[in-house]
Regions:
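Glycine-rich, Arg-bearing micro-motifs that act as flexible, cationic patches
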Residues: 110-131
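Structural beta-alpha unit
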Residues: 1, 76-111, 118
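Short, hinge-like loop/turn segments at secondary-structure boundaries
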Residues: 54-57, 105-106, 129-131
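Small/aliphatic-rich secondary-structure junction motif
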Residues: 2-52
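Short, flexible loop segments at boundaries between secondary-structure elements
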Residues: 135-145
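Short secondary-structure boundary segments
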Residues: 10, 114-116, 144-145
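A short acidic, glycine-rich active-site loop
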Residues: 56-69
């Protein structure tokens, strides 16, 4: 099976903890000669009670900051200028839902995602990685951090 697209999901809020995830995704994409797309998801406060506390342009600022941090993460993990070779997606909403939606949109054959060791809350709520694995229509490679 030859892959054309690998989607790597990273969390930019965890101080470069996903560098290893991104490096593994890049290795897999390179081995297959596949396009590497990198996604991060920012929360959608929208019309929630929390959203009422932010000014109108706050979401746009969050997305712009996320894009900058995503570029920085890619360059840190893969070397300066590496971010020019990948497509970057900053989505808004629920992390696992947006990852699955983008994977379907780009017809990814593989999703690479990081997972931390579960704690008690993960058993009640379910971590994003587990939800992606459970609901994905393509293969998922989980990198333990």
């Amino acid at each position: 099976m030859s892959m054309k697209t690998v989607l790597c999901a990273v969390d930019i809020s965890n101080d470069n903890r996903d560098v290893g995830v991104l490096k593994q995704a890049a290795r897999l994409a390179e081995m297959e000669g596949a396009q590497l797309d990198v996604i991060t998801v920012v929360p959608d406060f929208g019309m929630s009670v929390v959203g009422a506390f932010f000014d109108k342009g706050h979401h746009d600022k969050m997305v712009a900051e996320a894009r900058t941090r995503l570029d920085d993460l890619v360059n840190t993990a893969l070397g300066d200028g590496a971010s020019d070779d990948q497509r970057h997606v900053v989505a808004t909403g629920s992390a696992y839902e947006e990852i699955l939606k983008i994977a379907d949109t780009i017809k990814a054959e593989l999703i690479v995602i990081g997972a931390h060791k579960p704690d008690f809350s993960d058993y009640l709520l379910g971590p994003n990685a587990a939800r992606v694995v459970r609901h994905s229509s393509c293969s998922v490679y989980v990198v333990r951090s």
